[in-house]
Amino acid sequence: MNTSDRIKSTQIALDRDLREQALLLLKEVRAVDGVDALSEQFVRGLAEPGLGHSHLIVTLNDKLVGLAATDEETTELAVHPAHRRQGIGKALIDATPTSSIWAHGNTAGAQALASTLRMKKTRELLVMEISDRALDDSAAYKDPDGITHSSLANAPVEKSVAEAKWLQSNNEAFDWHPEQGGWTTHRLAQAQKADWYKDSDVLFLWDGEEIVGFHWVKQHSPELQEIYVVGLSSAYRGRGLGDPLVRLGLHHMRAHGARKVILYVEAGNTPAVAAYEKLGFTVAESHVVYEK
């Protein structure tokens, strides 16, 4: 039987046994590649049918060895390390309905497959990190003149008002971004359901009762934390407030035990990359979108 004939379409979120196999596959892939094959949203899609993700799977002897997860725009895939170079990745890419394929970590194997299929790199997302002395130095924070700070948990306005202002600030900051821009109240509410989410980890700079910017923190563990999203409202750009906004989050994370902080940034966002490098961040990983 050809590999393409082994591909089945399913929704893993509706099959508990298959979901457990998928999570095991992802664990085995990470152990070899050193990077997660699926992003957080697609991992959630393995358990939450409401996200509407569809899946293509390849099994051998009743064992899941290949998986492609797809939403309306992109696909992410994982192939078991012991079953690579057998045409599974190619078959999954050929069968997926989207043209955009994420290669997390952009491993040598992913690059070789993309080259074989003559796929073109159209987007690159960098993972940057900071730790130890550099983190301590960059975690120094002081409110700019006329500016105060809070978290969502102790905002100076009603929580619903703060959330509406946060949403507006986000959409102003990311009107160009394919995933982070154009958020709705429903999309924000869904994001707040993540098991790691805390109101106290959503930080704001305030000019009176107006949000200057926000810094959303994700705590993977006390030692490893993340600048999940950071953005300035349009009215406050170009006023030197981006640096204290980042430092506010770093100060918060360091105070909660962080020894390493990571972030994701578009490689093409040269000013942001340069600003993070100035703070002491270095590039740790590269994630790439290939178009077929």
From Swiss-Prot:
It comes from the Bacteria. Its EC number is 2.3.1.189. Residues 13-168, 159-292 form the N-acetyltransferase domain. GO terms for molecular function: mycothiol synthase activity; protein-N-terminal-alanine acetyltransferase activity. Acetyl-CoA 2 binds at residues 230-232, 237-243. Gene3D superfamilies: 3.40.630.30. Pfam families: Acetyltransf_1, Acetyltransf_7. It is an enzyme of class 2 (transferase). Acetyl-CoA 1 binds at residues 77-79. 1D-myo-inositol 2-(L-cysteinylamino)-2-deoxy-alpha-D-glucopyranoside binds at residues 40, 179, 218, 226, 264. Belongs to the acetyltransferase family. MshD subfamily. Monomer. Catalyzes the transfer of acetyl from acetyl-CoA to desacetylmycothiol (Cys-GlcN-Ins) to form mycothiol. This is Mycothiol acetyltransferase. It comes from Corynebacterium glutamicum (strain ATCC 13032 / DSM 20300 / JCM 1318 / BCRC 11384 / CCUG 27702 / LMG 3730 / NBRC 12168 / NCIMB 10025 / NRRL B-2784 / 534). The lineage of its organism: Bacteria, Bacillati, Actinomycetota, Actinomycetes, Mycobacteriales. The gene is mshD.
